[in-house]
Structure formats: structure tokens, C-alpha cells
């Protein structure tokens, strides 16, 4: 079922003129999709409650650094089938069905979101108040019709609370005015958590005994890069020269860090290189010692990395390597 859903999403994204990455296994995301300045990090799950805390944290952190929209596409929750046209949320990440995602890409955003107690909608509180006062309808009258308290109506008008879908429809019908607003699931800034500190990330790496990885990340950090260490992605770290409001102008290096090189490492590095090209970024494989030169991958030994002065020097090194392989 998951494989079918993944295939359908790939077809949909191609039809919608997105450039997409190859699917990943055992990662916090399955696909990266890009069109113009819109980027998606997509996780496909049959049961959206199977997303782990660790996966969600990493997905959010990568999305924030790449200025991308993290989204889960699934079919059910732990207890029930997911409703079409409704937005769910897990660990701050929006989750929808395939059909709801397709409608969003077609310009038809969902209007209902799932929360404890049922399904709710966002309404325009200012329009609600203006219309009620214009029609000379008291708060008490509207509360009685809606079967909620007067206090709740005041909260709706101040945008301090949202009604259930059922209550919103009653209010709309009584006032004869549209109040329900669509939910923008492509707002990448909404709900994104802050990244973990380097100290927290190092603690995890230390527990896993990855001394070589720590050495490389320390060197990159000393150069002046902002760093995000990963354990649930096809790359080991994302190094960012500086934060830019424009995703296209970010100098980002997707970094794989391995003591020894083998066929599996090369395959993963080539996939990461494809991601970097898709996102107008860079990729780098750092090894204990370089073996055979692979012209398709930008790689260097840790001793070479230690000789690099700063972020500018490393980016120039990568650019020079790219040009030499063309």
C-alpha cells in the first residue's frame, strides 16, 4: 500500500511540473520535490501515527534549513481512516490524504482540520462580527442558534477560537455570509520548530560512538558553517554558509561522512549529489583516506578538509571540483 501511494505521489508531482528526487529508503523523508520557489519534503506513511519523534524532529529541522514544506501523506491514523479534505497534524507537521494533497496542488485548499474533539475550521472573525452587527443580531441570539456560549461567540469574533465544521455551517447559513477560510498547507514557516543545538546533536553522535563524524563536523563548524547533523536522512550533515531569505541563494553543502568508501557509500553519495543539483546546492563526501577518484562525486580526505581555511575556501574547492568533472 505504501509503495502504491509513493508511486501515485511521484506521478502527481511530475504531472504538476515538479522536479523530484529519487525515493529514499529508511529516511525521515521519502521525496524532495521542487517547482519554482516551492519545495516539499514528503514522507509517505500508511498510518501517520507511525512517524517517530526522532523522524519528525529531523524532518522539521531539514525543512527549516532548506526553506521547504514538510508534509506527511497517508491513509489512516491509529484509530480510523483519514477524512478527505481534512488536515491532520503530527509533531507540528501537516498530514493529508493523497486526494487532499492533489486538490491543494490544483488550487483547492482544504478547509477542515482535525483536532481533539472533532473537525474544525478557520473563520474570519472580523467578517463575523461586522455581519452580525450589521444585521443587528445579538451575541446571545447567535449563540442560541449555534448552540454554543456567548463567550465562545466572542472568541470566534476575536479569532481566539475556531468553531467545529458543523457550528460554522450553522453560523454561515444564519448570517448568509461566507466565513470559512481555506488552510494553506504549503506555508513552510508555520509550526516549524527550532533546530536542536550542536551540543544536543553531539551528545547523540557520542552515544553512537561516531568519533570520525564528530571530527568532521567540528572542522566544518570551526570554518563558520551553520550545521545540522542527521541520522535519518541520506546525508550525514547539512552545512550552511549563511542564512538567506532567498532559498535559491543559500550556500548549502549536503555532506556524507564515512571513514571508508565502498559501493554502498558511493551510491548514497551519488543520490545526495542529485539532490544538491536539484536544489542548486553542493554535495561533499568526506573520507578518512581517499581511495579511487570518482569523477561523479566531490570527495576529499579529512586531512584535505583540515587544510581548508573557511567557508569561502571550501565552496571554491567544491566549485573547482565540479568544473573539472564537466
From Swiss-Prot:
InterPro entries cross-referenced by the UniProt entry? Arc_TR_HTH (IPR020886), Cro/C1-type_HTH (IPR001387), Lambda_DNA-bd_dom_sf (IPR010982)
One matching Pfam family is HTH_3
Per the database record, which ranges form the HTH cro/C1-type domain?
A: 128-183
Question: What are the record keywords, sorted?
Answer: DNA-binding, Transcription, Transcription regulation
Q: Which SUPFAM superfamilies match?
A: lambda repressor-like DNA-binding domains
Give the matching SMART domains. Answer: HTH_XRE
Q: Which residues, as ranges, make up the DNA-binding region of this protein?
A: 139-158
**One function term, GO molecular function aspect:** DNA binding
- Membrane-spanning intervals of the chain: none
Source organism lineage?
Archaea, Methanobacteriati, Methanobacteriota, Methanomada group, Methanococci
Q: Could you tell me what this protein is called?
A: Putative HTH-type transcriptional regulatory protein MmarC7_1702
